[in-house]
C-alpha cells in the first residue's frame, strides 16, 4: 500500500533579487501566537503567586490528572531513578555530560582589567546568577538531554543553587530518565511540577506543606510548549529568562554535491519533535530538491512518529526554497535565521563563514543536527522563530552577569575632570560636573578641604 505523498511546499526565488524584508515575508515560517494563550496562562500565574505550591499542585491535577506526594522529589526517588536505566543509556548520558561540560567549561570568560588612562582602571567581572530554575518538559518525548543542556552551563558558570522542575508522570514523579540525569549531574533539588504553573512557582517560590521553603529563583531557563513560553513572558519582570522559544526548526543550505538521502533523514529528524516543527531546504539545485523530497516520501511513513512528521513536513513552516546560486542561498539563510543551519556545499567552511544569523551552524555531512541535539558538546537550547538574528543560544554566558568595576585614584579623576564637567553642562546636568569639581578643586589626598 502506497503512503500519502508529503505536501512539501516549494518557493522558487530564481531569477529574482528579493530584499531582506521580502525574504523574511516569503520564506517558510510557522506562526506561534503566544499572545493567544496569555488569557489562559495569566490566571495560572496569578493563582500560583497567591496560592503557592498548593495552587500549583491543584492546577497540575486539573490539567494532567496527576498529583505528586510533594513538590520536592525525595532524594531516595532521585537516587533510585538511575537503577531504572539500562547501562547503555547511563553510559550515553555520561558521555553527553562529559562533552557538554568540556566545551562549556572552556568558554567561561575571564575577568578583564583595563587601565584606560593613568590612575583609571575599569574591570569587567563575570558574576554567576545566584539561583536558577531549569525547566525540563514532558509531552511528546522525554528530554534528559535538556536537563544536561541547561544544568551543565549553569554549573560551569558557577551558579550556587540549581532546581530542576519537570512535570510528574503517572507514578507521581518526573520521568525516571530525567531524574537519573539530575542524579548524574549532581542536582539534588527537583520539583515535580510542570507547565505554566512550574514557571510561576519557580519565579515566586512558596512554602510547601510541612513547612519546607521552596525558594524563588533569579532566572528560569529551558524549553517548553506555548503555555510555558507565555508564563515566562508573564514572569520576566520578576525573574530573568533565557528566551521565548518556539517550535524547533532546521534549515539546510545545499548544492548539487550534497547527499539527498542524508538531508532527507535530517529534515525528518527535526520534524518528529512537533507538528509545528520547521524543516527547510535552501538549494540552487532543483535536481537535489527533487531527490530529497522523493527520499522523504520514501522514508517518513516508516518512522516511529510518522503522523507527527508528516504533519510537520506538510505544514506552511516547511518546504524547499530554490535560489539561483549559493550566494543567494546565503542571503536567504541569513534572512531566515534558523535555529539549526546545516551546510552541505562543496566549500562548506567558506559558506559557513558567511553565515551571520543562525542559532547553531553544522558544517558538512558528518556534523548533523542530531549530533548537536545530544552530544556534540554544543548546546541545543537555541533561538527560534528568526530570533537568531539578534539572540544567542544557551551557554555558560547565559548564567553570568557582566559587571563593570570602576576604580580611579585622584590622578585618574583629575585627568578626566574637565571632560566630565564639559559634557555634563552640555546635557543640562551641571550637578554631575559639580560632583567632580567637589573632589578635584578642593580635596587633598585625605579627602579634607585645603
From Swiss-Prot:
CDD domains listed in its UniProt record: Histidinol_dh (cd06572)
Note on how the cofactor is bound: Binds 1 zinc ion per subunit.
PROSITE patterns attached to this UniProt entry: HISOL_DEHYDROGENASE
EC number: 1.1.1.23
Active site location: 339-340
Pathway annotation: Amino-acid biosynthesis; L-histidine biosynthesis; L-histidine from 5-phospho-alpha-D-ribose 1-diphosphate: step 9/9
GO BP field: L-histidine biosynthetic process
Residues annotated as binding NAD(+): 135, 197, 225
GO cellular component, one term: cytosol
Swiss-Prot/TrEMBL catalytic activity: L-histidinol + 2 NAD(+) + H2O = L-histidine + 2 NADH + 3 H(+)
Record keywords: Amino-acid biosynthesis, Histidine biosynthesis, Metal-binding, NAD, Oxidoreductase, Zinc
Keyword Iron appears in the UniProt entry: no
Family named by the database record: Belongs to the histidinol dehydrogenase family.
Protein name per UniProt: Histidinol dehydrogenase
Amino acid at each position: 500500500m502506497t503512503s500519502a505523498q508529503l505536501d512539501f511546499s516549494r518557493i522558487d526565488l530564481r531569477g529574482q533579487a528579493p530584499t531582506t524584508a521580502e525574504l523574511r515575508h516569503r520564506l517558510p515560517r510557522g506562526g506561534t501566537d503566544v499572545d493567544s494563550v496569555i488569557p489562559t496562562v495569566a490566571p495560572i500565574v496569578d493563582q500560583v503567586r497567591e496560592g503557592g505550591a498548593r495552587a500549583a499542585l491543584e492546577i497540575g491535577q486539573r490539567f494532567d490528572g496527576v498529583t505528586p506526594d510533594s513538590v520536592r522529589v525525595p532524594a531516595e526517588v532521585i537516587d533510585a531513578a538511575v537503577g531504572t536505566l539500562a547501562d547503555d543509556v547511563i553510559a550515553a548520558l555520561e558521555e553527553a555530560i562529559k562533552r557538554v561540560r568540556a566545551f562549556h567549561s572552556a568558554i567561561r570568560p575571564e575577568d578583564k582589567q583595563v587601565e584606560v588612562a593613568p590612575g583609571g582602571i575599569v574591570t569587567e567581572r563575570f558574576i554567576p546568577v545566584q539561583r536558577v530554575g531549569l525547566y525540563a518538559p514532558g509531552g511528546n518525548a522525554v528530554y534528559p538531554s535538556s536537563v544536561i543542556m541547561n544544568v551543565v552551563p549553569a554549573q560551569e558558570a558557577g551558579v550556587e543553587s540549581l532546581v530542576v522542575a519537570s512535570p510528574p508522570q503517572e507514578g507521581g514523579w518526573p520521568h525516571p530518565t530525567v531524574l537519573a540525569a539530575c542524579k548524574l549531574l549532581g542536582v539534588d533539588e527537583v520539583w515535580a511540577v510542570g507547565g505554566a504553573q512550574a514557571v510561576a512557582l519557580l519565579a515566586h517560590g512558596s512554602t510547601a506543606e510541612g513547612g519546607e521553603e521552596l525558594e524563588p529563583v533569579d532566572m528560569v531557563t529551558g524549553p517548553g510548549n506555548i503555555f510555558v513560553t507565555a508564563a515566562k513572558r508573564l514572569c520576566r519582570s520578576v525573574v530573568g529568562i533565557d528566551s521565548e522559544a518556539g517550535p524547533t526548526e532546521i534549515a539546510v543550505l545545499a548544492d548539487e554535491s550534497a547527499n539527498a538521502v542524508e538531508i532527507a533523514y535530517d529534515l525528518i529528524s527535526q520534524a518528529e519533535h512537533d507538528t509545528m516543527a520547521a524543516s527547510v531546504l535552501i538549494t540552487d539545485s532543483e535536481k537535489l530538491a527533487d531527490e530529497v523530497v522523493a527520499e522523504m516520501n520514501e522514508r517518513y511513513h516508516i518512522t516511529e512518529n510518522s503522523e507527527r512528521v508528516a504533519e510537520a513536513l506538510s505544514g506552511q513552516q516547511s518546504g524547499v526554497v530554490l535560489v539561483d546560486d549559493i550566494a543567494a542561498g546565503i542571503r536567504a539563510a541569513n534572512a531566515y535565521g534558523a535555529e539549526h543551519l546545516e551546510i552541505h556545499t562543496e566549500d562548506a567552511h567558506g559558506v559557513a563563514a558567511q553565515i551571520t544569523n543562525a542559532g547553531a551552524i553544522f558544517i558538512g555531512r558528518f556534523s548533523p543536527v542530531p549530533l548537536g541535539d545530544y552530544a556534540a558538546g554544543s548546546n541545543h537550547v537555541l533561538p527560534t522563530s528568526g530570533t537568531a538574528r539578534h539572540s544567542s543560544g544557551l551557554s555558560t554566558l547565559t548564567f553570568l552577569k557582566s559587571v563593570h568595576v570602576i576604580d580611579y585614584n585622584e590622578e585618574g579623576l583629575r585627568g578626566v575632570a574637565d571632560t566630565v564637567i564639559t559634557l555634563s553642562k552640555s546635557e543640562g546636568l551641571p550637578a554631575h560636573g559639580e560632583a567632580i569639581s567637589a573632589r578635584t578643586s578642593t580635596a587633598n589626598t585625605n579627602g579634607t578641604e585645603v
